[in-house]
Amino acid sequence: MQPGAALNRRLWLCLGLLQGLANGYSMTPPTLNITEDSYVIDTGDSLSISCRGQHPLEWTWRGAQEVLTTGGKDSEDTQVVQDCEGTEARPYCKVLSLAQTHANNTGSYYCYYKYIKARIEGTTAASTYVFVRDFEQPFINKPDTLLVNRKDSMWVPCLVSIPGLNITLRSQSSVLHPDGQEVLWDDRRGMRVPTLLLRDALYLQCETTWGDQDFLSNPFLVHITGNELYDIQLYPKKSLELLVGEKLVLNCTVWAEFDSGVTFDWDYPGKQAERAKWVPERRSQQTHTELSSILTIHNVSQHDLGPYVCEANNGIQQFRESTEVIVHEKPFISVEWLKGPVLEATAGDEMVKLPVKLAAYPPPEFQWYKDRKAVTGRHNPHALVLKEVTEASAGVYTLALWNSAAGLRQNISLELVVNVPPHIHEKEASSPSIYSRHSRQTLTCTTYGVPQPLSVQWHWRPWTPCKTFAQRSLRRRQPRDGMPQCRDWKEVTTQDAVNPIESLDTWTESVEGKNKTVSKLVIQDANVSAMYKCVVFNKVGQDERLIYFYVTTIPDGFSIESEPSEDPLEGQSVRLSCRADNYTYEHLRWYRLNLSTLHDAQGNPLLLDCKNVHLFATPLEANLEEAEPGARHATLSLNIPRVAPEDEGDYVCEVQDRRSQDKHCHKKYLSVQALEAPRLTQNLTDLLVNVRTSLEMRCPVAGAHVPSIVWYKDERLLEKESGIDLADSNQRLSIQRVREEDAGRYLCSVCNAKGCVNSSASVAVEGSEDKGSMEIVILIGTGVIAVFFWVLLLLIFCNMKRPAHADIKTGYLSIIMDPGEVPLEEQCEYLSYDVSQWEFPRERLHLGRVLGHGAFGKVVEASAFGINKGSSCDTVAVKMLKEGATASEHRALMSELKILIHIGNHLNVVNLLGACTKPNGPLMVIVEFCKYGNLSNFLRVKRETFDPYAEKSPEQRRRFRAMVEGAKADRRRLGSTDRALFTRFLMGKGSARRAPFVQEAEDLWLSPLTMEDLVCYSFQVARGMEFLASRKCIHRDLAARNILLSESDIVKICDFGLARDIYKDPDYVRKGSARLPLKWMAPESIFDKVYTTQSDVWSFGVLLWEIFSLGASPYPGVQINEEFCQRLKDGTRMRAPELATPAIRHIMQSCWSGDPKARPAFSDLVEILGDLLQGGGWQEEEEECMALHSSQSSEEDGFMQASTTALHITEADAESSPPSMHCHSLAARYYNCVSFPGRLVRGTKAPGSSRMKTFEELPMTPTTYKASVDNQTDSGMVLASEEFEQIESRHRQEGSFSRKDPGQHMDISRGHPDLQGRRRRPTQGAQGGKVFYNNEYGEVSQPCTEGDCCPSAGSTFFADSNY
């Protein structure tokens, strides 16, 4: 251990123990092996005493100091202190050994704790008294002088080596014997004698007799004194500083008893040279005498610096005082920080000091400044004292020092940081404690503190009583609100929250120049009353806000309802109900305002307040209704049986707040409509009508409250029947196809409580009914013929537009089982459907807006109650058929359902949640809802915020690592084809059904898109396709439009099936009677209609191109025609996007291999992309790619060079080449090449294959085609049906599709949008995920209206109109 460290440890131990003693704490004392209070041995014997304790020990005894100072050889041999072995309870041990003891070794032997200054017997020390008997030397004291003063008694220290002797005290004139009262003897201390008996003594000796021999002690000379020194002072008291050549004057003064004598002596550096002179002075006062000695040196030098000591002695007492004299050669100023440049304080402190270490002579002038402004007041240059510290006290303080005479100036600055305990601002304003049931509520805590609180913690507890410490106001004697002292607070989470949590966000924003932390807890659906609190911390304090979240069905906890709700009519029964929540209000009362008292004598309106409503209103009798069981509100009803016009006026319901005792009131104005007698605005007139025509008669009525209008014909009541219609509250009579018997007298009678009014008219009918028989026959015949031709045309049109039934099943479903496993036409019958596992009740499914629709089906957003085996409401997507669907379309959707069941659950596949297949309604397939829509639209929207190397949060990186590590762990444990690849990442206990109200980590619309995100999306798609391949399923339409993006950057592969309108989607090109996504199809699929997992790998390469071009359409500017298909077959490929790294480019190239068997498997792609994502290799690749670009010409880009290099390394070259040639020694990480076993490194390099063909390098032959309406592509070019027929016929002539030679050229088409300005945040993402899409994929989705759907997490759009 270093000496400094040991010293520090000792000081720490000493201070700690002293502190413990000062505070009264007990301490275990050391113990001796000799337990007797006194111990007797004979001279010549050896003495050994061991001491043990809990702390380091030390010994002291009479004569020990002499041994240490003399260092004689004898003493070293006879007196030894050594360490010994301690015990577990007392680990420290010291043993004292004395050999050949003699009488002078008699005395007390103390063992004490070494680093504790206080030596307290029985606490910090232990001792024993040892007598070393020497019968020839019973007395062991030395000659000494005894000063006899005015004390009552004194000890004559006649020390003995033999205890129990009879001792007498002898002087020149008397002998004193111990009498046990005034004269006492102690074997350890000597003889105690009254001072009066010693006034005349000149000397004293102790005498004893042992055997026949008398012994006398050494004599004590007696000196009688009454001179007492009181105090001594040396001026100046502190150290004295001088310059060379200045005069030094020191004054040493002693205060002594009156008429005393004192001798002064000085000790100083120049004493031998007699540099100083001192002069004594004496001043007699009334009660004492002042004696001084003044030392003077007229011209000091460097030799005079040092300590100056003054000693005063009167023969009895001796006082010493010293000071330090410092001599400087020249003036100087030196200032340093004492505690560092930055000091901290807390707002509210009474005082803070800003100290500096200042050394200067002569004392300089000074000024303190704060932020370059002078600090007023009187201050000290050594420390600036600030009182009542506030946040405004923070700043930079500067001390300016200067000596104008010497031309010296120094400045030093200190920064004061004032820490402010956090404070929640919402506590200052009253907040509502009543919240409406099923409402969306936001609880906010805005806090400010220094340092800024790092987080805001939210807690909740059930609405149950808990102990409250409340104070009482002395004035009102009512309890104030106190913070409940509850111990059952729980952290707010999305899993076990009593009210579903939509989001919990915390951010920092600048308010009034201060950075404040804002935390918002959004409660999606207020269902249950609870207590919430937010807690904030920083290093100097904490604050919390308690929120009483009381949920009620009454708006604002207090409302008035009236029956009827509209203005009542005179004579109606009226009921006014005042409803108030029992938790908040009590003492309900009804009043009616007096109009005469609402104005003063001058007619001015008076201020109406709920506190004085009784002064302007009349109390009314009302009935308190009996509350229903479980009800938490009271209802006070005011009933008016027959309302009259004089009842019109203002009615006030008054309630009282239970806590504050404040009164609140609501006012309801009751407007009464006076009842009037009915009157006709128009009388009936006589009519003449033809037979088989229509007749209409009106009886318009004016006047309030018409209870009945009755029609009569020939004094017989006319009622509504076939051909006779009464409308508009019976004010209009209509007769269809008038007959002869309808002629007669018609009467309209209108009555209410005030009376009746009538009007009548005659109706005459002319013509005969026989004349219209032929007309009816002709009309009916014409109608039947028209309907027949219309149905015939409709059937012809449907047969032309619709594909065959088998085509519907196989053509509109993207994901199918491998035909090699199960034939397409047998897949629906082969797969089973378990009703008990997947059937979901229709009545618990609430359909919302349409997310997308196709020619035969549609996808609807819906709210499913309890689909996750709980009581929560989840937002789902429902696939269903349009109205009028055929049995074939029904079978196609059923096949899709069974395929989804067969596939099973996986994180990167849109999973099946349930289905409605029972015959009491339409067939509905319920799948997961992905709020961010398809990946293609998402990437296009995020182009503006693309930042390739933006830092990801630790949570995002944890998710990325979990994806890769989870995939590797599952593959190692169960194999890549096992169904257990469905990861547990963010999905709960292995279930695809999401837990309710999962809190989203962040809003993807607000975060920038990075290169790491693109690699992550690619990895997840590859993993999902690996799972589909393991389930013997083929997708056939793998593209970015069929990849959906969910929370936490999770992508899911979907199959829109019947819900995609391929007739309007420009990505589907007509081929014969079908429309196909040619840009994503492998050559064998285009020419041979062969769909395999290898053809899905080709589509995956095109998907990679889409991802790394940020949503661009493949083959930009290329005409999709016969020449395109032929060149694709011949090996021409797209150029890689600019954002693609070398590894990504190699993956694309390998996916586009002409030989399907040479393409990588999805398991290889998962491994490579996983390594890229986990290791961050894309960053290194980008740097190497930039270096590669700089060394190549613009004509031969990095993709071409890197691709050809990787393709054409032969096996021999690979064995002979150095390791650096293989992927830059990073083959295991796949940074600069793609290592597919047996895929890329094969065969020999074909001659002349140093470069590959791209579409833009070979000129396109301009050809004009006539575009039909249904042949649309995104490039504006079409490929007509007859062209495909030519391709197919030519292909049949050439033979079946075969792969090109490995050395064949491959072509990459360049296409990348302008990426300038990516850091601008898009405006469409500023509203929390609402996205507006172009018309390429459908119309803008609309949010669900209130009540139409269950609130979903984030309340965002589905983000894809084609779902």
UniProtKB/Swiss-Prot annotation:
Q: How does it sit in the membrane?
A: Single-pass type I membrane protein
Identify the stretch(es) annotated as Disordered: 1289-1330
Catalysed conversion reaction: L-tyrosyl-[protein] + ATP = O-phospho-L-tyrosyl-[protein] + ADP + H(+)
**Stretches of the chain found on the membrane's Cytoplasmic side:** 797-1363
What positions does the domain Ig-like C2-type occupy? 44-118, 151-213, 230-326, 331-415, 422-552, 555-671, 678-764
Cystine residue pairs = 51-111, 158-206, 252-310, 445-534, 466-486, 578-653, 699-751
Q: How is it modified after translation?
A: Autophosphorylated on tyrosine residues upon ligand binding. Autophosphorylation occurs in trans, i.e. one subunit of the dimeric receptor phosphorylates tyrosine residues on the other subunit. Phosphorylation in response to H(2)O(2) is mediated by a process that requires SRC and PRKCD activity. Phosphorylation at Tyr-1068 is required for autophosphorylation at additional tyrosine residues. Phosphorylation at Tyr-1063 and Tyr-1337 is important for interaction with CRK and subsequent activation of MAPK8.
| Coiled-coil annotated spans | none
Binding sites annotated in the UniProt record for ATP: 851-859, 879
How does this chain assemble?
Interacts with VEGFC and VEGFD. Monomer in the absence of bound VEGFC or VEGFD. Homodimer in the presence of bound VEGFC or VEGFD. Can also form a heterodimer with KDR. Interacts with PTPN14; the interaction is enhanced by stimulation with VEGFC. Interacts with CRK, GRB2, PTK2/FAK1, SHC1, PIK3R1 and PTPN11/SHP-2. Identified in a complex with SRC and ITGB1. Identified in a complex with SRC and ITGB1.
Q: What does this protein do?
A: Tyrosine-protein kinase that acts as a cell-surface receptor for VEGFC and VEGFD, and plays an essential role in adult lymphangiogenesis and in the development of the vascular network and the cardiovascular system during embryonic development. Promotes proliferation, survival and migration of endothelial cells, and regulates angiogenic sprouting. Signaling by activated FLT4 leads to enhanced production of VEGFC, and to a lesser degree VEGFA, thereby creating a positive feedback loop that enhances FLT4 signaling. Modulates KDR signaling by forming heterodimers.
Q: What is this protein called?
A: Vascular endothelial growth factor receptor 3
Q: Which gene encodes it?
A: Flt4
